[in-house]
Amino acid sequence: MLNEIIEKLFYRNNPKSREEVKRRLKLVIAHDRADLNPEIIQAMRKDIIDVVSRYVEIDDTDSEFLLENNQRATSLVANLPIRRIKAKPTQDQED
């Protein structure tokens, strides 16, 4: 039912922009249901990037952090493009 309302409200001739609107709305709903404010999400993003960066070199300019919501749960999805695997652990990891 929610999808039908979204389609009626945001129908456009361009299916790509319609899909983008649906994706953004789902993201807003997931953020709202998870009760996470933008500051918390940014802090989580930084912490995740810091930990993953100990093991691999990532392209953080193209990284994505999304909250996805289905009827049962809200999930944090991190898409982190890997440039290369680090040969040795960084100093932080050894401590």
Curated annotation (Swiss-Prot):
Keywords: Cell cycle, Cell division. It comes from Trichodesmium erythraeum (strain IMS101). Belongs to the MinE family. The lineage of its organism: Bacteria, Bacillati, Cyanobacteriota, Cyanophyceae, Oscillatoriophycideae. This is Cell division topological specificity factor. GO terms for biological process: cell division; regulation of division septum assembly. NCBIfam families: minE. Transmembrane segments: none annotated. Prevents the cell division inhibition by proteins MinC and MinD at internal division sites while permitting inhibition at polar sites. This ensures cell division at the proper site by restricting the formation of a division septum at the midpoint of the long axis of the cell. InterPro entries: MinE, MinE_sf. Coiled coil: none annotated.
